[in-house]
């Protein structure tokens, strides 16, 4: 194990000098530096650049407070390695695989794997056309998720990405079992804490591994924590042959941390100040999130859209890797429609008659047609009022409004805020409900009866309570 000495510390960037005869550590190797003489407080550094003349530039995974010039640095000879396997289930840990849930730390002999790996080769990949039922009507009907696919939840600040991810974790864990890995990348610690206790209460935590690198941590940790979560998911897929769910909240923070690291390393920024290696970094992460012949990884990624601008390089780069996109729209939150999923902007490769079936496809496309026509008529209604519409158009507007409200539903994870029980709606019930609305079966029921309900039977009960 070769050793060097700290030459300079600039925030999270640490330059380390190795003696001229020593072998320099490789890029991505983990280096260890002890803050104190009794070797209780260590900091892990990751090699990012070789500057020449025995000097390497590293990024710290923890705060560099207390580091001084001249401290000894040890090369571990390998990349950061994290615990994998069944021992990780029910536990919460950081980017380095250290437990942060106040329970017993992992044993020394636990299986560990490096966080940097190659993506599976082309001949190992497998594709599936099986739908993953989520119990959320708007998703299952208009932008269904594929088992083993990649899903992006796009939205600006405060439109409900994290709540939607939490509901998906709840529904999929309760209905499908299976193993989940939740990776919190640069998000709020409070939300992670809430999620942990919720999962503990519901018993879902026993089948979930949780990894966090939150907002307050150095950019190195936020940039690498997604790889830590992915490494755990890959082990369950490749070694145990499991179907794994990988939740990442938020993939934009991964890009943001990469941008900070890039600037600290002195690279010239690219478009909108992002790192020049944006597409490469995103590609290296996303290409590893895939399904092989041994098992599948279905990934659901929240993607923050800065200033609601979808042309921003960060969300635009992520778009290219996804099978399904669920777009959250601020206008819908203002109308009180939750989840605020835009039914026309959201899309899925799975919405085809070969995968979802003829009836589902026909109902979904008709729902989109009615909503699109309603959107076109809104300008006329705003200027001239409803009276200028033909009878046929008035009927269409009535149905479109009922459909728009029926696309909303109460969430189990939001019950503590709304006081209303959440609902899980099977795909067959979702398709039947929308088909009957399109047929005009419920034209007489008030629009408000369709708001925030589960299956169509709930609408009828709500209308009866309202006196219809």
UniProtKB/Swiss-Prot annotation:
<dbReference type="InterPro" id="IPR050053">
    <property type="entry name" value="ATPase_alpha/beta_chains"/>
</dbReference>
<dbReference type="Pfam" id="PF00006">
    <property type="entry name" value="ATP-synt_ab"/>
</dbReference>
<keyword id="KW-0067">ATP-binding</keyword>
<dbReference type="InterPro" id="IPR000194">
    <property type="entry name" value="ATPase_F1/V1/A1_a/bsu_nucl-bd"/>
</dbReference>
<keyword id="KW-0066">ATP synthesis</keyword>
<protein>
    <recommendedName>
        <fullName>ATP synthase subunit beta</fullName>
        <ecNumber>7.1.2.2</ecNumber>
    </recommendedName>
</protein>
<keyword id="KW-0813">Transport</keyword>
<dbReference type="InterPro" id="IPR004100">
    <property type="entry name" value="ATPase_F1/V1/A1_a/bsu_N"/>
</dbReference>
<dbReference type="GO" id="GO:0005524">
    <property type="term" value="F:ATP binding"/>
</dbReference>
<feature type="binding site">
    <location>
        <begin position="155"/>
        <end position="162"/>
    </location>
    <ligand>
        <name>ATP</name>
    </ligand>
</feature>
<dbReference type="Pfam" id="PF22919">
    <property type="entry name" value="ATP-synt_VA_C"/>
</dbReference>
<dbReference type="InterPro" id="IPR020003">
    <property type="entry name" value="ATPase_a/bsu_AS"/>
</dbReference>
<keyword id="KW-1278">Translocase</keyword>
<comment type="similarity">
    <text>Belongs to the ATPase alpha/beta chains family.</text>
</comment>
<dbReference type="InterPro" id="IPR003593">
    <property type="entry name" value="AAA+_ATPase"/>
</dbReference>
<keyword id="KW-0472">Membrane</keyword>
<dbReference type="GO" id="GO:0016887">
    <property type="term" value="F:ATP hydrolysis activity"/>
</dbReference>
<keyword id="KW-0139">CF(1)</keyword>
<keyword id="KW-0547">Nucleotide-binding</keyword>
<dbReference type="GO" id="GO:0005886">
    <property type="term" value="C:plasma membrane"/>
</dbReference>
<comment type="function">
    <text>Produces ATP from ADP in the presence of a proton gradient across the membrane. The catalytic sites are hosted primarily by the beta subunits.</text>
</comment>
<dbReference type="Pfam" id="PF02874">
    <property type="entry name" value="ATP-synt_ab_N"/>
</dbReference>
<dbReference type="InterPro" id="IPR027417">
    <property type="entry name" value="P-loop_NTPase"/>
</dbReference>
<comment type="subunit">
    <text>F-type ATPases have 2 components, CF(1) - the catalytic core - and CF(0) - the membrane proton channel. CF(1) has five subunits: alpha(3), beta(3), gamma(1), delta(1), epsilon(1). CF(0) has three main subunits: a(1), b(2) and c(9-12). The alpha and beta chains form an alternating ring which encloses part of the gamma chain. CF(1) is attached to CF(0) by a central stalk formed by the gamma and epsilon chains, while a peripheral stalk is formed by the delta and b chains.</text>
</comment>
<keyword id="KW-0375">Hydrogen ion transport</keyword>
<dbReference type="InterPro" id="IPR036121">
    <property type="entry name" value="ATPase_F1/V1/A1_a/bsu_N_sf"/>
</dbReference>
<dbReference type="InterPro" id="IPR055190">
    <property type="entry name" value="ATP-synt_VA_C"/>
</dbReference>
<dbReference type="InterPro" id="IPR024034">
    <property type="entry name" value="ATPase_F1/V1_b/a_C"/>
</dbReference>
<keyword id="KW-0406">Ion transport</keyword>
<dbReference type="GO" id="GO:0045259">
    <property type="term" value="C:proton-transporting ATP synthase complex"/>
</dbReference>
<dbReference type="InterPro" id="IPR005722">
    <property type="entry name" value="ATP_synth_F1_bsu"/>
</dbReference>
<keyword id="KW-1003">Cell membrane</keyword>
<dbReference type="GO" id="GO:0046933">
    <property type="term" value="F:proton-transporting ATP synthase activity, rotational mechanism"/>
</dbReference>
């Amino acid at each position: 194990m070769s050793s060097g000495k700290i030459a300079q510390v600039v925030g999270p960037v640490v330059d380390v000098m190795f003696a001229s005869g020593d072998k320099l550590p490789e890029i991505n190797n983990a280096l260890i530096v002890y803050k104190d003489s009794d070797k209780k407080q260590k900091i892990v550094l990751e090699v990012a650049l070789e500057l020449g003349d025995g000097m390497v530039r590293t990024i710290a995974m923890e705060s560099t407070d207390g580091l001084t010039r001249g401290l000894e640095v040890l090369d571990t000879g390998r990349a950061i390695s994290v615990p994998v396997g069944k021992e990780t289930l029910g536990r919460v840990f950081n980017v380095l695989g250290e437990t942060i849930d106040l329970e017993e730390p992992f044993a020394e002999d636990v299986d560990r794997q490096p966080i940097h790996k190659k993506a599976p080769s082309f001949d190992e990949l497998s594709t599936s056309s099986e739908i993953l039922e989520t119990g959320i009507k708007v998703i299952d009907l208009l932008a269904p998720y594929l088992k083993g696919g990649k899903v992006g939840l796009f939205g600006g600040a405060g439109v409900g990405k994290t709540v939607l991810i939490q509901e998906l974790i709840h529904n999929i864990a309760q209905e499908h079992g299976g193993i989940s890995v939740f990776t919190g990348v640069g998000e709020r610690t409070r939300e992670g804490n809430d999620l942990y206790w919720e999962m503990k209460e519901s018993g879902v935590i026993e089948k979930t591994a949780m990894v966090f690198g939150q907002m307050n941590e150095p950019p190195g940790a936020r940039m690498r924590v997604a790889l830590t979560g992915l490494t755990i998911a890959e082990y369950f897929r490749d070694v145990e042959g499991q179907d794994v769910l990988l939740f990442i909240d938020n993939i934009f923070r991964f890009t943001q941390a990469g941008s900070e690291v890039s600037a600290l390393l002195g690279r010239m920024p690219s478009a909108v100040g992002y790192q020049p290696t944006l597409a490469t970094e995103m590609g290296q992460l996303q290409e590893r999130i895939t399904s092989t012949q041994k098992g599948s990884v279905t990934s659901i990624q929240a993607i923050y859209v800065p200033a609601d601008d979808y042309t921003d390089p960060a969300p635009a780069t992520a778009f290219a890797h996804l099978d399904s996109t669920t777009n959250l729209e601020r206008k819908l939150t203002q109308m009180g429609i939750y989840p605020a999923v835009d039914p026309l902007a959201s899309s899925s490769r799975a919405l085809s008659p070969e995968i979802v079936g003829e009836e589902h496809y026909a109902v979904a496309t008709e729902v989109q047609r009615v909503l699109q026509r309603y959107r076109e008529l809104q300008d006329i209604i705003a200027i001239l009022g409803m009276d200028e519409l033909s009878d046929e158009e008035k009927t269409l507007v009535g149905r479109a409004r009922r459909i728009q409200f029926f696309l909303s539903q109460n969430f189990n994870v939001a019950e503590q805020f709304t006081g209303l029980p959440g609902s899980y709606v099977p795909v067959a019930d979702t398709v039947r409900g929308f088909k009957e609305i399109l047929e005009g079966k419920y034209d007489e029921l008030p629009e408000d009866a369709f708001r925030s309900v589960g299956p169509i039977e709930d609408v009828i009960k709500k209308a009866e309570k309202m006196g219809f």
